[in-house]
Amino acid sequence: MKEIIEELQAKIDAIMEDKSQKLNRGLKLYNDVNNNESMIRWSKEDYDMFIDYFDVINHPIVKKHRKEHKKLTPRTLTFLLLCSMGKSDEDIRQIMALSPEGLRSMRFRLNHDSD
């Protein structure tokens, strides 16, 4: 029984360490966004870590967006989170490396999705 408990504790510790590293990375990405740094080199995992971190610091906003829009990609949810952070269209375009048409298209798809 003691061996099972030790094994489970080791698994819990490994999961906690992994989650801690991901949240730390999410914090770094969040700070980058606050400084209007570009996401152009972000991987899908980076988007996921940013969203996970944002969910920890502002769960109601993430929950609201997920409820209002059923088919959110990590990139689209990140766009909504940037809007929630009060970023201007120009800032969002710079951060997400979007053209004016790309920004319009994203807004159109989101408005169409929420109908």
Regions found by a protein language model. Name each.
Residues 1-53:
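General nucleic-acid-binding
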Residues 35, 40-115:
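Cytosolic nucleotide-binding catalytic cores of signal-transduction proteins
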